[in-house]
Structures are given as C-alpha cells and as structure tokens.
Amino acid sequence: MIEANHDRLSGALDGVRVLDVAEPLGVLVSRILGDLGADVIKIEPPGGDPSRNLSPFVTLEEERLSLPFVRANVNKRSVILDLDRRDDQQRFRALAEQSDIVVSTEGIAAWAARGIDLDRLSIFYPHLVWLSFSTFGLLGPYSSYTGNNIVAEAMGGLSYIQGDDAKPPCVSPCEQGVYLASIQAAFGALMALWERRSSGQGQLVEASVHEVLANLYFLLVNYGLWSDIPYRIGASNFMPPNGYYPCKDGYVFIAALMPHLWEKLVDVVGDPRLQDEALRDAEYRNEHPERVDPILREFTARFDRWTLMETLQRHGVPAAPWSTVADVASNAHLNERGFFIEFEQPLFGKLRNAGPMFRATASPLRIRRPAPQPGEHQQEVLAEAVSQVKREPLPAVAGARRGLPLAGVRVLDLSRAWAGPYGTRYLADFGADVIKVESAQFADPREPGNPGYGEVNRNKRPITLNFQTAEGRELLKRLVAISDVVVENFSPRVMAKYEID
C-alpha cells in the first residue's frame, strides 16, 4: 500500500464546527469528532472542566496534568463561559449559530434556564445537530437521575454478566461502558450531519449510555426468545477451547470454536485424546470441558506465552498472549505500524499516547493540537463569534424528504461471524441497502436459526456466492463495482486471492 502524506490531507470533518458542552461524561464524543477533522470548541465553566481533576496525573514543579483529560481533549480549543450569566449565554448562542454540532450532557430544564428550548431547536437553530449524551436520556422516569459509567453498566445489565457467578458482579475497567456509548453517540451525530446534506436541516439526537449497554451482547433478544438469563462465567471457558490457558510465564488466549480451527488445534497439540470424533462437536465440548481443558493445559504449560502464540498462529489457530500494559507499549506490531503517537503538550513536553481508532488513507485521523489550557483560545474564538456570519440551513436536495440518513447508499457485506456483521447492521438500520454475501463453502458460524445471527443481520438482503468458481468471482467483482462501501474481515491475503485489491 502507498502511504499518503497525511500532513497534506484534510480530515473527513474538515470545515465542521463542534461545540463541546459535555463535561465530563461526553468528552470522548467530541474527541472522536475532532480526530476526524472537526474544529471542536470546548466550553469550560469558570475554574475549568472538572475532568481536569481526574487521576492519574503528571506533575512538574507546581503544575499537574490529568492524563485522562489529555486523552479525551486533544484536538480541541478552550473557551471559559459561565452559562448561568446572561452575557455568556449570548456568547454561547452566537457560537451555536456558527456551529454544526453541539455535544451536551445536560437536560431540558438546564438549557431552558439558559434560554434554549430543545423542543424548538428547529425554529431557532434549523441548521444545528444537537447531540444530547447522558446516562439515561432526556425523558423518562430516570432522566433526572445522577449517573456515571458504573450506574449505567449496572442498570444496563452489563455488570450482571461480568465476573464470577459465585461472587458479586464486576464493572468493566477503564469506563468501557461510557467509551462504547461515546462511539455510538458520535456515530449518531455523524448520521444526522449526513442526513442534513439532503434535507438541509439539523435535528436533535439523543444517546443514552443506559440504552447503548442494554443493546449489547444479545441479552435482550435471548431473553425475549427463551427467557434466558446468563450466568457469570468468570475466567472459565465457554465452548472450549475459548479462553486463557497457563504458560510458563503467564497465559495465552486460544479461540478455536469453528470446526476448521478445532482441527488445526488438534493437529498442533498432537494428543490422540483430542482426536475422538465426539469432540468435533462444539456443543459436546461445551458440555464436557473436562475432556478438553486439562489436555490443553498440559500442552500450553510447556511453552512461554509468546512462543506458543507464534506456534499456534503459524498453524492458523487464533491465539494471543496475556499482555501487561508494558507489553502493549512495547508491542512490535503496534510500533511497526506507527500506532503510537507523540505530541508536544505545553508545560510538560513530549507525551506518547495511543493513536486514532481507525485509519483512513485519504482523510486520516490525526492529532492536530494538544489538550488546551483553560480558556487558552478565549480571544480568538470570541473574535470569530463577532466576525463570522451565522450558518444558515443548507438548501435541500430537490424532491428530498426527511428519512433514514443512509437511504441510497449500497453496502456490500462480505464479513462473517460477529464484528463485521454487527457493524454493517448499524449501516442497515440507518437506511443503507446492505447486501450480505455468504459462501456455501464457508458458512457463517452463526446459523440462521441462532438469534445472534438474526440480531446482526437484520435489514440486510442475503445472497450466496461460490468464490471458488470463476463465475462467483466475476459476480463478486460486479457487486463491488456497484457498491458505495465494501466491508470484509478476511485475513489480508483473501481479497487479493479473489482479484480485488
């Protein structure tokens, strides 16, 4: 692949302005939009954003820097406004008139007290996408409740399935619930922004951490079909081999659920006890883990974790070593791909951090500016508020009616199993024509009768192609040619094998 000169390329949201009034729950939402190229203006209260006080800190003489704050607030400019004062409310409204998206974590009453009626945004701010991001949403019996990541994970059912069944539930580390919901919220704002291209109008978008987490892991669909309430499996293996196995210096994770992966693992281990025909059945292995796990533990205990990972991967078995944070920071693969980035943080010098969440060759995500000091950009932003004209609604496309934002977009879905189909389902839910291509030779491990299959493949049109024939490959190329988006989760060599590079 030819590497582009990223310094000369614009971001996907170049020219889009975002007002960030999302302290501290929603700061990652606007960070995502900033990474995509948007001009994000962070509105901080007098005294600064409370998330500046989140530990851990880097301390230099009398100054201290919150690392979580830096992580969530690069690519932003900072302005101090007291939104309880009338003059600053007017300044905020002037900025809103010149912005495309507002990201807020406060409710209807708080904004009404400041003279902004969220029910009448389309009248006073017809161009604006207003994203409300909160624990429980704008309306409903819990909408006024105080919430955070732990509260949302408990209420959304995520904590219930985490941990050991004999012990209390566990919360996920590093506020994963809020992180996941932030990605969903940013996606919602992008969908509204895309819809504005045809309708010319903005809209109010709600994203609730509670609802995002309640939508995970097929919990509701399984309960709706079978009244199934899962138990917490802790570190035990579900459908072995699928879990951590001990090594000389730690653990390795092995995931060989599908039949061809099981066969490869059996060949590598070379133990005749695993060659029993009954063990080819994943359900049987799940019911009799004592016939699998002890043998695998004997095998894995002979190796160090990195050697075992390389051995298994060389034979096509998915495996990864248990990694400490130090292991991740020194990981050869991440470093060679340039995943880690360094940027200059005022007062503290050079910081090393994780890079953007995905790569785009023509509109790369990148760090354009460090996390700001409180009010660092006060004068320039307020001067822009005076000098710039307010943004008007865009002219609507002739004959366009408001509807699903991705209507008219065609997506060719070649992905299998979980991650790919789940992603394309979101595109289908928002109106894209998603054509799901399956192969008779390599059936999706989630069978059509499985509720998980239906959950990730709703709103799609399925077809079957035989990629092993010239006719099948030609049909695949024709489908690629008439699609706007192609999604696949094959290993890197597969698409080239089908003559699509």
State each model region's role:
Residues 182-203, 215, 219-225, 266-273:
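Oxidoreductase and adenylate-handling cofactor-binding alpha/beta cores
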Residues 315-368:
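A glycine-rich dinucleotide-binding beta-alpha-beta segment and adjacent secondary-structure elements
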Residues 138, 167-176, 197-211, 231-237, ...:
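Conserved Rossmann-fold dehydrogenase catalytic segment
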Residues 1-198, 373, 377-501:
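N-terminal helix-loop segment corresponding to the beta1-alpha1 unit
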Residues 40, 313-327, 388-390, 434:
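Short, well-structured beta-strand/strand-turn elements
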